[in-house]
């Protein structure tokens, strides 16, 4: 499974992304995608999107989400788990399999 998480801090400060990714590292969560997007209501602020391996019910993810929730509340921000979805590894084809 993969899970998507969105995070927005109330105010931007240096080191916020580092701190959030540290929570994932402490819980041995593998991030597969990270993106920042402008927040439409306040263009000077950003929403961080994280994709990770694991289901939202995984205890490791829950622990990291709790730590992130506490961190963003201090800056009057928010976090939202967008959901979990099944994921299947892509098959890599070799030259023999590609021949007609």
Where are these regions (language model features)?
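A conserved regulatory-domain signal marking ACT and ACT-like small-molecule sensing domains
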Residues: 1-100
